[in-house]
Amino acid sequence: MAAEKTLQEYGVLCIQEYRKSSKVESSARNSFMGLKDHLGHDLGHLYMESTDPQMSAAVPWPMVEKPTMDTVNSGKEGKGVSEENVSSGDSEGSTSSDHESEQLSSLSVEPCSLTKTHRQLCRSPCLEPRLLKHSDILQDFKPEESQTPSKEVKKPPDVVREYQTKLEFALKLGYSEEQVQLVLNKLGTDALINDILGELVKLGNKSEADQTVSTINSVMRETSSLESQRSESPMQEVVVDDGENLRPVVIDGSNVAMSHGNKEVFSCRGIKLAVDWFLERGHKDITVFVPAWRKEQSRPDALITDQEILRKLEKEKILVFTPSRRVQGRRVVCYDDRFIVKLAFESDGIIVSNDNYRDLANEKPEWKKFIDERLLMYSFVNDKFMPPDDPLGRHGPSLDNFLRKKPIVPEHKKQPCPYGKKCTYGHKCKYYHPERGSQPQRSVADELRAMSRNTAAKTTNEGGLVKSNSVPCSTKADSTSDVKRGAPKRQSDPSIRTHVYQDIEEKLPTKNKLETRSVPSLVSIPATSTAKPQSTTPLSNGLPSGVHFPPQDQRPQGQYPPMMMATKNHGTPMPYEQYPKCDSPVDVGYYSMLNAYSNLSISGPRSPERRFSLDTDYRVNSVASDCSSEGSMSCGSSDSYVGYNDRSYVSSPDPQLEESLKCQHMHPHSRLNSQPFLQNFHDPLTRVQSYSHEEPKFHPKRPLPHLAMHLQHPAVGARSSCPGDYPSPPSSAHSKAPHLGRSLVATRIDSISDSRLYDSSPSRQRKPYSRQEGLGSWGRPSYGLEAYGYRQTYSLPDNSTPPCYESITFQSLPEQQEPTWRIPYCGMPHDPPRYQDNREKIFINLCNIFPPDLVRLVMKRNPHMTDAQQLAAAILVEKSQLGY
């Protein structure tokens, strides 16, 4: 009975659903929404009742179909009010069904509590017809309602996406959107990407005249026309403004008329032709100057034709008559050329004439420049006025730009490439390609050549600066007289030097020649050099810094002849006849002092503090100034000084020559003299102790004080003193031969000759010194400088360092040394006020180039240097060391 009631209930429910389905046909959407609600409730009850997995399959149907119906419902926003009314009406009909379903659930629960089989039996026949009904209803609605809106809403986005993906793919490959549209129109929107790509490749390979790419050609033509319009737009703007952009024109009427009349007749028609030519070009400011006397009637000596043209142009305010009048029957004419040039210059215009106006060009330089740049010459070909297309020459502006105030950018004058866009030369093509735009028209090779030229120019400029930094720092004494007479610089030709020295010696008295040769010169030291020991003999004391010699010239002295040892840098030794013999007993043993120091190697790092001036840095330990033909020491030369009595002069074949050479040297017995001799050197004391047989007592690490350079004997052309400090003699007095060739340094001629140094020193009176005075002067802390008239302008080193001469003993001099001595001197310049003025001027000039502190520092270290170039070189060296 219960089963029958259940079936009846289900039958009633199906009938009600069928009736509702008929309502859906009239208003499909509204009734379907009500049915959906009813089915949702009904299936919800069934889901609660059943645990069978087969029944759970009914659950996804409303869950899947509900979003679809919701989308359909969301698309109908305008019918919201009517939907609410219909749904409210349907809810009344659905209340009964809901009530019946509740009863059904209550009825179905009871049998389920009794037997499970009955629940399955009553559930299976009642659910299947309902599911069939639901599927039929959905099939009725899908083709009518849900499918048509889905096509309308969903398909267009898919088409757009496909089109966008295909378009992006083609654009990435370099094709244009127009080409993609052509291919899609040909193949359809559903074409595969491979087909589209193949068609695009075919389309790209086809010629421009193909019909399939006609639209592309039109687009290309449009773009090219736009570009041409853009390129021509400034031209058009200039043409529009050409009347304002054109320069004023001033015509020399007399010159034009006579040129048209073949220099025989004043043809006014020529003026008319010239004016018309400029008017046709758009010129508005045209002025023609003609002398007023041309208004007179024609005469045999002054033929004039077409005078009415002058009247007409005057009425048009184009022609202007320059004043002229008659005074006592004579014509007084103003210079019309001056009117022409003046007006053209003031109005910044153009002069039309075949005259050069040389007389006016010489009056004012601005007129000369204006005439050179603004003169337009012309020619008449029958009755045609023809100015040149290049008024200022082949490389000048064109005629159009010449007549404009602001010239137009010149068009490319290169020949267009015959291959056009098919040219495969690229940037190497020498022809003009308009599609390149602003790219350089020169080939790559030309660009590289231009870059290499610029780089070479830069390196050349930088090279000059580098050379200036490497200029050796040298201390040289130049007087104002040397600056005035332009002393010769360092020369490599010995013959030139010989003539110079001969001229100087002719002017100097014989009494002073030896003294001139005894004046020591200074040696330039390179700013940066690597100091290497040049002798294997170890020094007992620390080598002073400041002397550097590169190793390239480290050759034994024996390779050179005795009289050519120091002149090998110049090629030719000086003749012996130039050097007169000296009879001074002092000089006999002078170069014997060299033997004492022949084993020393001059090396050590350079220190800027060790560079001293001419008066303060008198080196005695490198007294290698020779009266022979040695050249002065070159910068960085490491040729060694040689004890002449040991090696060079022993091999002299001529005894008289040897005697004359020995007169410039000291006695060979004084091989080594004391360390104080190196430190505290004085002329008479040198003579005394140069004959001493005492071995020196060394003070190894004692710093060398400033030395007075009163006794150094460079020969004519010899330079002996090095600007650095010099080492002490070695402890052994007999180590001479093995190191003679490498010990001391040969010198080369410097930029200042000995005679010049002599001229720069004051002509003082030489004072004789006796042996006792010489011995007594050792104890004087003032060094005996006052005896020479030398006033000390700077402080000597600290006296805290005890002198080294206290332990020195002196032997008696030979009898031949008893006569008084003439002591050479190189001291202060001749005129101290002028000397200071020059120094001040040099200081001011150098301060304009270098930092004042640096200039002051270098000038303090070189107190007697008056050569601005040498000071600048020293400043550059100091600047590089201090890291300015």
From Swiss-Prot:
Residues 87-96 have a biased composition (Low complexity). The modification Phosphoserine is found at S231. Residues 246-401 form the RNase NYN domain. Disulfide bonds: none annotated. Gene3D superfamilies: 3.40.50.11980. Pfam families: Regnase_1_C, RNase_Zc3h12a, UBA_6. Keywords: Endonuclease, Hydrolase, Magnesium, Metal-binding, Nuclease, Phosphoprotein, Zinc, Zinc-finger. May function as RNase and regulate the levels of target RNA species. This is Probable ribonuclease ZC3H12C. It comes from Mus musculus (Mouse). The lineage of its organism: Eukaryota, Metazoa, Chordata, Craniata, Vertebrata.
